Amino acid sequence: MFESIQGLLDEHADLQIRLSDPAVHADQSLARKLGRRYAELSTIVEGYHQVQQLSDDLAAAKEMASEDSEFAAEVPVLEEQLAHAQEKLRRLLIPRDPDDGRDVILEVKAGEGGDESALFAADLVRMYSRYAESKGWKIEVISATESDLGGYKDIQIAVKGRSNDPAEGVFAALKFEGGVHRVQRVPVTESQGRIHTSAAGVLVFPEVDEPEEVEISQNDLKIDVYRSSGPGGQSVNTTDSAVRITHFPTGIVVAMQNEKSQLQNREAGMRVLRARILAHQQELIDAENSAVRKSQIRTMDRSERIRTYNFPENRIADHRTGYKSYNLDAVMNGDLGPVIQSAIEMDEQSRLDALSGSSE
């Protein structure tokens, strides 16, 4: 697996030269793209040098072991360190999701359960917002439709966080949140104290850095305008400011009504549409690659139930990874790291298994 690393070392050296050229930074989109790739390769180069150094140290220790007991004692320690470094490098060489370094547009939609589901959708948004704050990311509400009790029938938020390392990107962490989230608790509307089960759906899309990344022909769009509505369906605007955009080639439909003007809603709608089309394009690429399709959690059915939040037991369980913990209160306050990490590790292992299988 390490045989192909020389090409990556050469690419890293070439990128270092290119990024020192002021002309490259005149094109911010190009500079950002090259910077992400350089950061990704820097981690691999560092891991490779660590393996080389430990290999040299181990060889020297073995050579001196027969003459010096201290060197002999170092041999098993260095062997363990080398094995760990090789495994780390092997994982670093697994091809990354090309969208890992991107920001995210995250949608939460109330599902079965009526008002309780809408309240749970609001709880999920709060959970993601607090997790984002802990990572130093920024949250922006793009569109939201509130329920009568203050929850969300649906909401779209942008999550932004600058990182040159794709492994630390917003999409790298949040892409595994897509799916159906089930909650078990006593609703605020329940007078008998009975536990109810409801659900909310989460969709996660990588956001494009520049509008030009996704080509959209105006001939492929149908744009309808209508009056925006608030909780209970009542009209909150006397003008046709809400916008519904249909993209014929993909069948994707985006509705936007939060902004005050039709133009602002159209711009917000196009922003979301570009993110959805980008995700759609990547899904088509994944579908052509059987190894990726089989290994990535990201490509699972969005209607799949991925997680259960059991409030009476203070328990959270991820049904894909087997993760279970009894600190639901902390998770709902943004302590989402261990849950997300379980999905990242499962995805890495699946990719590694697929890669190992293809090389046999």
Swiss-Prot record:
Keywords: Cytoplasm, Methylation, Protein biosynthesis
Transmembrane residue ranges: none
Disulphide bond pairs: none
First-listed, main subcellular location of the protein, grouped into a coarse class: cytoplasm
Post-translational note: Methylated by PrmC. Methylation increases the termination efficiency of RF1.
Gene3D superfamilies noted in UniProt: 3.30.160.20, 3.30.70.1660, 6.10.140.1950
Superkingdom assignment: Bacteria
Gene Ontology MF, one: translation release factor activity, codon specific
Subcellular compartments: Cytoplasm
Residues bearing the modification N5-methylglutamine: Q234
Listed GO CC annotations: cytoplasm
Protein function: Peptide chain release factor 1 directs the termination of translation in response to the peptide chain termination codons UAG and UAA.
Family as reported in the entry's similarity comment: Belongs to the prokaryotic/mitochondrial release factor family.
PANTHER family: LD18447P (PTHR43804:SF7)
Name of the protein this chain belongs to: Peptide chain release factor 1
Source species of the chain: Renibacterium salmoninarum (strain ATCC 33209 / DSM 20767 / JCM 11484 / NBRC 15589 / NCIMB 2235)
Lineage: Bacteria, Bacillati, Actinomycetota, Actinomycetes, Micrococcales
